[in-house]
């Protein structure tokens, strides 16, 4: 009888612990996409196109921006920043493919192709390619897959706080000024998408 009681108590404690972990996981600031899975190869259509980048033969796609959705934005968030970076681009110097900010916390995602052009849902910054909207991968051929990182940053800055046309470096400097702690960030959610040229799944 004592053994059964101990087992029952242990089982109940385990159940409570699992429930608490599940509840905590449900509250995590999360970025997701129906276009690709985190850490997996992205479809060819998200790569930049020859129509946009006629002088770059490495652009083999249709420049269709991925679908994104997010949930559990941290309390106190006043605006969101979205950054897309290829850290292996330009021989390791990095390429900023998309810089967007001033996104209202009431926005919960972007449809596929929605940010391949300017949108009133965000303030456009300035990518390495010099545009204010999504610019897809132009991965050099015959290299290992590049890791395209997508970071959604919650901030305490008002949506109109940052002017249009800022680079990624200028945005991050505004978010975390070195001489003026604390940072203006409330949390971050991210994904990584892979792309290789020649493309294959």
What are these regions (language model features)?
Residues 6-7, 22:
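Intrinsically disordered, low-complexity repeat segments enriched in small/polar residues
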Residues 8-17:
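Bacterial N-terminal signal peptides
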Residues 1-5:
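Positively charged n-region of N-terminal signal peptides that target proteins for export
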Residues 22-201:
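N-terminus-centered regions that define maturation/targeting leaders and the start
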């Amino acid at each position: 009888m004592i053994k059964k009681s101990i087992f029952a108590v242990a089982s109940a404690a385990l159940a409570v612990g699992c429930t608490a972990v599940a509840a905590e996981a449900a509250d995590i600031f999360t970025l997701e996409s129906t276009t690709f899975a985190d850490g997996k190869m992205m479809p060819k259509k998200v790569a930049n196109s020859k129509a946009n980048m006629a002088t770059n033969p490495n652009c083999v796609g249709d420049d269709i921006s991925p679908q994104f959705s997010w949930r559990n934005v941290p309390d106190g968030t006043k605006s969101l920043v979205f950054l897309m970076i290829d850290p292996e681009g330009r021989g390791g110097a990095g390429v900023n493919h998309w810089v967007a900010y001033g996104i209202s916390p009431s926005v919960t995602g972007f449809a596929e192709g929605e940010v391949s052009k300017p949108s009133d849902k965000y303030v456009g910054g300035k990518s390495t390619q010099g545009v204010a909207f999504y610019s897809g991968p132009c991965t050099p051929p015959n290299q290992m897959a590049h890791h395209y990182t997508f970071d959604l940053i919650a901030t305490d800055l008002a949506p109109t706080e940052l002017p249009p046309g800022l680079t990624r470096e200028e945005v991050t400097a505004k978010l975390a000024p070195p001489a003026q702690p604390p940072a203006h960030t409330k949390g971050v959610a991210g994904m990584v998408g892979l792309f290789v040229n020649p493309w294959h799944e």
